[in-house]
Amino acid sequence: MTQYQALIIGFGKAGKTLAATLAKTGWRVAIIEQSASMFGGTCINIGCIPTKTLVHDAEREGDFSVAMQRKVAVVNFLRDKNFHNLADLDNVDVIEGRAEFIDNHTLRVFQADGERVLRGEKIFINTGAESAIPAITGLTTTAGVFDSTGLLSLSQRPARLGILGGGYIGLEFASMFANFGTKVTIFEAAPQFLPREDWDIAQAIARILQEKGVELILNASVQAVSSQEGAVQLETPEGAHLVDALLVASGRKPATTGLQLQNAGVAVNERGGIIVDDYLRTTAENIWAMGDVTGGLQFTYISLDDFRIVRDGLLGDGKRSTRDRQNVPYSVFMTPPLSRVGLTEEQARASGATVQVATLPVAAIPRARVMDDTRGVLKAVVDVNTQRILGVSLLCVDSHEMINIVKTVMDADLPYTVLRDQIFTHPTMSESLNDLFSLIK
């Protein structure tokens, strides 16, 4: 049995950053990842990096096969870099294998050449999330059905792509494949498109997708999936639909299966997410959980912040917690991207605040004209009494950069007038925040 001060299960953003930090302070660390193809974590290998690389090339009407080759090169470079960032440290052992708990201090690791047992003073779980597959007849047995990981491995572009689920993952793939030239159909079971966004924002997104040729079918109750003449057939009460490939984009769930958490006294919620407190401590006193596996917001930057919280608890004053996050922005990398921080208009009004709303069409922004992309709208919700920004939605080119400016102002508890009167360079998309907040009176 090998003894470590820290055992880290999962090579994700929080896990790999914590491993390097602890090792550099003298801890003996082992990080366990069940597949060498996942060194570096979900984001680098099957998430943010490969998808955004393809989005970038699709926006430039690049060749699909060439884009796929570039995607592989980008991923391989970053995976190798991440591996050596840890493996080259003297007191870090990178172990390929599947881990399960024997007790709250001991792991059994199954490797290609046998088993080994590791013991750790402290253990950190960073196993991420996995695709949630709905119970639809034939969905898991029909050729041509993929989750996002499988679709990212295609060598040839499908002429027709069906997407099961109209959420944020589905949006990115729909926009990307449409830009590559694929006929895309989104099958959304709900009666409303993007219910987490304001209706006007959701409608603007729908129009942009439809202009790309994307078909959006709401109330699409897919009852069965099967193979039909070399294609994938989706059966609904309204009739059958044929596609060449089907993406299952119905969400992701915490990856806790097989960890044998009960042996360590680690509790999970009804969705399998590991229950943690504000400091990411589990129900076992020497075990922490970080990132998507807790069932919270599934963003790489949240996983990174989880690392900061755990680091502060181990090496600092222990005051940092999840309560310090304030306003968490997000971006959906469709074309153009959607970015939001804070409340929607509907949420703000429901809170009882007296609000004023400003909207600005992207067509009114000079930089958008320069970049020849005038699609979308900017929207701000402000509390009239406090002059504080309650929320902002940006559907426009470069919104993924702009939203971080808004978050900074909101976190600093500054009035909206800071953005209204801020000096920005010209011509830029950021200066449109001047115009947007000038509409608040």
Residue ranges: model-predicted function:
Residues T2-Y4, S35, T42-V117, E197-A220, ...:
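N-terminal Rossmann-like dinucleotide/flavin-binding domain of flavoprotein oxidoreductases
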Residues C48, I125-K183, F187, E215-L216, ...:
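Glycine-rich dinucleotide-binding loop and its adjacent helix/turn
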Residues I9-S37, T42, I49, T53, ...:
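Flexible, glycine-rich terminal cap/loop adjacent to redox cofactors
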Residues A6, F11-F77, M176-R196, E401:
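Beta1-alpha1 glycine-rich phosphate/pyrophosphate-binding loop at the start
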Residues D93-E96, E100-Q111, L118, G181-D278:
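A Rossmann-like FAD-binding core segment of flavoenzymes
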Residues M1-G12, R157-G167:
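Beta1/beta-strand and adjacent pyrophosphate-binding region of the FAD-binding site
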Residues G40, A73-D80, L152-S153, P158-G162, ...:
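Rossmann-like dinucleotide-binding cores of NAD(P)H-dependent redox enzymes
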Residues T140-R157, A240-D317:
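FAD-site-proximal beta/loop scaffold in flavoenzymes
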